[in-house]
UniProtKB/Swiss-Prot annotation:
Reactions accelerated catalytically: (E)-2-methylgeranyl diphosphate + H2O = 2-methylisoborneol + diphosphate
Annotated Low complexity bias: 24-33, 105-114
Keywords linked to the UniProt accession: Lyase, Magnesium, Metal-binding, Plasmid
Name assigned to this protein: 2-methylisoborneol synthase
Coiled coil: none
Biased composition annotated in UniProt, kind: Pro residues: 11-23, 52-64, 71-104
Note in the entry: 2-MIB is a volatile organic compound that has an unusually low odor threshold. Together with geosmin, methylisoborneol is responsible for the characteristic smell of moist soil as well as unpleasant taste and odor episodes associated with public water supplies and contamination of various foodstuffs, including fish, wine, and beer.
Gene assigned in the entry: tpc
Cofactor(s) essential for the protein: Mg(2+)
Organism of origin: Streptomyces lasalocidi (Streptomyces lasaliensis)
Amino acid sequence: MPDSGSLGPPTSLPEQPPAPPATAPDAPAATVTDRPVTSSVAHFLAGLHPPVTRPSSPPSPSMPPASSNPSSPPSSSMPPASWAPPSPLSPPAPSLPPTSPPATAPETSAATGSDSVVRRVPVGPTGLGTTALSLARRQAAVPPDAVPAPSGPSAEGPVVPGLYHHPIPEPDPVRVAEVSRRIKRWAEDEVRLYPEEWEGQFDGFSVGRYMVACHPDAPTVDHLMLATRLMVAENAVDDCYCEDHGGSPVGLGGRLLLAHTALDHLHTTAEYAPEWSESLGSDAPRRAYRSAMDHFVRAATPSQADRYRHDMARLHLGYLAEAAWAETGHVPEVCEYLAMRQFNNFRPCPTITDTVGGYELPADLHARPDMQRVIALAGNATTIVNDLYSYTKELDSPGRHLNLPVVIAEREHLSDRDAYLKAVEVHNELMHAFEAAAAELAADCPVPAVLRFLRGVAAWVDGNHDWHRTNTYRYSLPDFW
């Protein structure tokens, strides 16, 4: 997703963003002391993952599928009738009219019936100044027979044998088609992201399916587009600065710093500001960052936008560590690699789930150490998923690419197969730790905004795995089974 020429005026107007939530200052985290939590850890986890039938992959010969682990709840279990999720809230009333989509793409409805995860997620604003932090409003849990089965055949793609994961319903095809149409128009007309010869790679990215799967509670396609533009922009920076299309570790720090100013603007003197502003249009990654962030800040609160900027700084720091190792030919220890991957990972994507969902997790609740642990574990687990599914793709690419199986094989003197299987075990342990930490936080702080955010992060983790599994254009599994 690279540069296709110098910046010029866009040939089409961008879609109108969803109305921003209220921008009241952050308040102290809510304290709940008088309402006991009735759901157990297992019940909370079961409520995150409605049952979905998928064809199963053959088990690994050296270890049983992780879903059989007795210490974790099965992904197909349902919460008992006594467990009630937070009640749905009224959807926000936008102060700006949404973009009128084609007749086939509903804009103002919540996720369709196929997005059954959203049936357990309250919709509407939960920002400051609303009633979202009230714990009095509850409703009965949706009974299992009220959850519609996914419509249509599931996309094909094998699951890594032994990988602990949760299947998801098929993403709404109407939303997928509309997001795909809009993001391609944005990439080609507004930011001119790639030359014509790279169009097939952009289409093969399947970002529309990706974002619809990861954000089942997004109230409109406009909200989905917030995440989709940012995802495409992040990948443009990775591809053009670090990886496939002209990327190099040499000079990466300077390129990343200047690109980051498209997210976190330079404040300087009148003499030098015009030159900086002009630089934001000098290449495709910066054009994409600038446009995607402009859309995002119009819909997000100031604290949500600042949260995203900090998470992107973390990502760029991880890029620089990996680049430094590439320049010197250093293969890190496994713990060093995992530390790098805690920064060079998907964290900026799930942590905008509240903005995409049309509500806000207040800054004080986001900053809680237990919430930060949940977010870190989710990002780490999803990033190892990427290592596992992109393993053969990276082996076939020029140069040496570090991923967890490669580092384990090198540092622990294991065969490629045994190292890959151990990486699966690392992923599974991270996933179990993420789910346990999320359940503990839900029990300790059962505030509706917290519960919804946790469900949003879990949905992103599941959708991210499903996209890797189904994207056979990009990924294939090694022949280890």
